[in-house]
């Protein structure tokens, strides 16, 4: 919900707006004219500002990866999973032999770029490992698929095993300048021993809205896993570039057939024919841009969000233009007399109409300029964090053009009817008395008022529901303990002996418990294992853990048993799977054998011994999928750490403090680790917050937009009420002569608006629920839609409307009946 400051701001703005609107019609003609222009300008500036912000985010998503797409020729090949009822029906990670088969499947395939982002850079100046600077291993085809633009050097020599390509920003960060970077060397770690690479090219940074924007260094993939064709080596992304004029529909069957022939199910080649047939028939080529909207690929785009933001932006401008129309109509009683006098003295009707249209266009241009200035100011403030899009001219230019065009056309249309209508009166008739709008004009006003009430309700309910959902996912019980827990990567060397790490960490008085795994429990990138169990091929995410891991996190066993210390000493391994695992593979049961998954090795015997209650190991945008914990006493590979990730339970409230000193403690455990550095730590609750940082930005953006849109709607309502008051002055004067009091005038003015508000509310409830349900589709876990958001929306809109009516009633009650009747 809105905070107290926001509510206070709304109240102040409404009061000031009410006073401004009153001044527009109570002051002298010149001052009233200036005030009216300022009032119109304020509404247009607010609407234009919000339109640019919202549509900037939409345009960012709509154009994502478009600079990389080679005019629509870049695709991602996806094949269906073995089981069609899985929450994630497609896979896009492949082995090197599978990618080679795709590359040779058709002459229309120009190149298939291969990428793996596993690897760590070493700072050439300090020697520290740069885990926060993403680097990628790619093949020669990759530089053919994507448009690298060299500033220095050339990418033609990337086939060398010791070559590297560095982007401009990474070059400045690592070496201080582009010139210093070119020709220099850096170390790239994929195993214990580094690869020394020479920088053969420094290229321009890729645009901010593409998947390569955060990768700073590219090194050759070489022969890594080139001959590995079992599912545990499906670790590479494949980007397909088709030749110009080639049809994706024609190429797809050839690629699917080539992939199916090179698809290996472990040691078994007797894959059921229906599965292989589904691979041939249901594989697909997905345009690169569409991957931005796929949460399985950690895509940050959301078509639901884009639809909601687009609707809000368009309706925002609609509200502002309706306000412009209503204020123009409200000012007719003043402007038409002046225009009639001008016509009597020879002014042409067409010139008067043109003047009003040009005035409206100038007003739009001024509003557009002020809105751009506000956007520029916002770009340098903390409020810019509400958007994931950089607020610069390169990103926003298309949005500016569309906004200016829509604003100009809308503003012209908004003043045309009042201008033509005002010019339709005969000067002699106008100068003899006051004008009244036609019945159709009154019906239009009622319809406009109903529409703005409706928008107000929808905006408020939707904005509050987004806040409800964000609090729901932030506070949602993931199924395991998250409070006061740190996760640390021990480093390559310190993590080789977990018991030494345990002993040292438990000496810290702020640390109460420690456990180990090969990766974090709450994952932003999921790595899948594939096994064959009783003839059934299973695919699941998993962790290799110590026996105390499940107890540490409070994970509940619902069938079978949990791990024991004996399991951690046996040469054969043990599995505990989640409930989703058994739902996905109903033919598998406790006691069934399944090949082990010790870090750095596989092929050992293991058995499923228990089932753990389902828990969320990803953010709540993803459904719960099959997961397995593995534990064994197998000897570790001496060259690698089996459990490089340590989870630490801290004293209440100490997680952040412990996280700050934990990397230093871990780096000191080994002389090699002390030299290399690399240990790092995260607070689990902060990790959860980062998962929903995008949703939090979205929530704040929509709530601010909803607040401003409500303000615009209320200002429009204020203008309509004032117009209504102008048309019933004579009736009010007669009632006052017959003894009508202020409460009588309140009842006279408020009845119709209460009915309109209630009718709009009744219409808005199902519409709001539909919008809310549409938006909630992006979440696997959804909060219930509370009734109070609709009740408070009705109270808020109706209360503010009655407040406006009360202000107008007080104003009109102070008029002199005799003066009003004499004017009539």
Language model region names:
Residues 2-45, 294-298, 328-354, 358-361, ...:
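Alpha-helical transmembrane segments of integral membrane proteins
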Residues 322-361, 716-754, 815-816:
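Interfacial "coupling" helices/loops that link adjacent transmembrane helices in transporter permeases
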Residues 53, 284-286, 360-425, 468, ...:
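Small-residue-rich transmembrane alpha-helices
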Residues 9-15, 32-61, 301-337, 365, ...:
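Hydrophobic alpha-helical transmembrane segments of multi-pass inner-membrane transport and secretion
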Residues 51-120, 226, 233-240, 252-253, ...:
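Membrane-proximal extracellular/periplasmic loop immediately following the first transmembrane helix
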Residues 139-152, 164-301, 503-694:
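Mid-to-C-terminal secondary-structure elements
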Residues 61, 77, 102, 143, ...:
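Generic structural signal for small/hydrophobic residues in well-ordered secondary structure
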Residues 4-10, 28-38, 68, 260-313, ...:
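Membrane-helix entry/capping segments
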């Amino acid at each position: 919900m809105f905070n107290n400051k926001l509510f206070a701001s709304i109240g102040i703005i409404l009061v000031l707006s009410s006073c401004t609107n009153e001044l527009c019609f109570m002051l002298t003609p010149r001052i009233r004219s200036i005030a009216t222009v300022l009032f119109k300008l304020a509404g247009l500036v607010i609407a234009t500002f919000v339109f640019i912000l919202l549509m900037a985010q939409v345009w960012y998503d709509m154009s994502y990866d478009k600079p990389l797409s080679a005019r629509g020729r870049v695709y991602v090949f996806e094949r269906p999973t073995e089981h069609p009822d899985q929450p994630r029906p497609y896979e896009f990670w492949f082995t090197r032999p599978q990618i080679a088969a795709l590359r040779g499947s058709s002459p229309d395939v120009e190149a298939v770029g291969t990428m793996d982002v596993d690897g760590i850079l070493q700072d050439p100046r300090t020697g520290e490992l740069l885990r926060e600077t993403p680097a990628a291993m790619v093949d020669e085809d990759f530089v053919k698929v994507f448009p690298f633009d060299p500033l220095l050097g050339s990418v033609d020599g990337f086939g060398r095993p010791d070559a590297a390509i560095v982007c401009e920003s990474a070059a400045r960060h690592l070496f201080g300048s582009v010139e210093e970077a070119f020709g220099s060397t850096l170390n790239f770690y994929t195993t214990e021993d580094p690869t020394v690479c020479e920088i053969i090219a420094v290229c321009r940074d890729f645009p901010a809205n593409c998947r390569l924007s955060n990768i700073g260094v590219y090194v050759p993939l070489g022969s890594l896993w080139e001959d590995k064709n079992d599912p545990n080596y499906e670790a590479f992304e494949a980007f397909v570039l088709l030749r110009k004029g080639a049809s994706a529909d024609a190429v797809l069957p050839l690629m699917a057939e080539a992939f199916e022939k090179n698809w290996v199910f472990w040691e078994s080649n007797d894959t059921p024919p229906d599965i292989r047939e589904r691979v041939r028939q249901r594989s697909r080529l997905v345009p690169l841009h569409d991957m931005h909207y796929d949460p399985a690929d950690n895509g940050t785009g959301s078509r639901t969000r884009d639809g909601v933001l687009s609707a809000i932006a368009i309706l925002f401008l609609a509200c502002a233009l309706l306000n412009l129309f209503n204020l123009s109509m409200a000012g007719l009683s003043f402007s038409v007399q002046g225009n009639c006098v001008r016509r009597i003295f020879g002014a042409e009707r067409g010139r008067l109409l043109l003047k009003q249209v040009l005035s409206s266009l100038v007003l739009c241009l001024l509003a557009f300029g002020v809105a751009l200035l506000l956007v520029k100011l916002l770009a340098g403030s903390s409020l810019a964090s509400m958007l994931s899009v950089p607020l610069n001219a390169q990103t926003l230019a298309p949005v500016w053009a569309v906004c200016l065009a829509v604003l100009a056309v809308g503003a012209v249309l908004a003043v045309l009817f009042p201008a033509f209508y005002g010019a339709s009166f005969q000067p002699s008739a106008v100068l003899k008395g006051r004008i009244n709008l036609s019945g159709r004009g009154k019906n239009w006003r009622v319809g406009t008022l109903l529409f703005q009430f409706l928008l107000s309700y929808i905006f408020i309910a939707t904005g509050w529901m987004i806040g409800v959902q964000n609090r729901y996912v932030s506070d949602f019980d993931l199924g395991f303990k998250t409070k006061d827990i740190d996760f640390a990567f021990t480093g390559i060397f310190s993590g080789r002996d977990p018991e030494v790490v345990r002993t040292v960490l438990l000496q810290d008085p702020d640390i109460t418990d420690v456990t180990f795994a090969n990766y974090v429990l709450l994952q932003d990138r999921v790595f899948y294992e594939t096994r064959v169990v009783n003839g059934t091929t299973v695919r699941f995410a998993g962790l290799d853990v110590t026996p105390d891991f499940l107890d540490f996190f409070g994970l509940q066993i619902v069938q079978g048993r949990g791990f024991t210390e004996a399991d951690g000493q046996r040469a054969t391994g043990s599995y505990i799977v989640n409930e989703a695992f058994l739902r996905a593979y109903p033919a598998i049961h406790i006691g069934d054998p399944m090949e082990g998954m010790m870090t750095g090795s596989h092929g050992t015997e293991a058995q499923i011994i228990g089932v753990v209650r389902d828990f969320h190991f990803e953010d709540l945008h993803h459904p719960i999928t099959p997961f397995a914990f593995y534990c064994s006493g197998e000897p570790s590979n001496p060259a690698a750490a089996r459990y490089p990730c340590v989870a630490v339970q801290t004293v209440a409230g100490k997680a952040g403090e412990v996280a700050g000193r934990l990397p230093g403690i871990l780096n000191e455990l080994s002389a090699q680790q002390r030299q290399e550095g690399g240990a790092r730590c995260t607070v689990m609750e902060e990790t959860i917050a980062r998962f929903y940082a995008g949703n939090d930005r979205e929530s704040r953006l929509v709530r601010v937009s909803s607040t401003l849109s409500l303000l615009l709607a209320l200002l429009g309502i204020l203008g309509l009420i004032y117009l209504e008051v102008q048309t019933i002055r004579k009736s009010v004067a007669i009632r006052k002569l017959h003894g009508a009091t202020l409460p009588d005038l309140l009842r006279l003015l408020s009845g119709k608006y209460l009915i309109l508000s209630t009718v709009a509310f009744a219409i808005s409830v199902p519409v709001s629920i539909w919008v809310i349900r549409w938006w909630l589709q992006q979440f696997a876990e959804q909060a219930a839609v509370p009734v109070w958001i609709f009740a408070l929306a009705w109270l808020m809109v109706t209360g503010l409307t009655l407040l406006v009516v009360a202000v107008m009633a007080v104003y009109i009650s102070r008029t002199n009946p005799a003066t009003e009747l004499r004017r009539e």
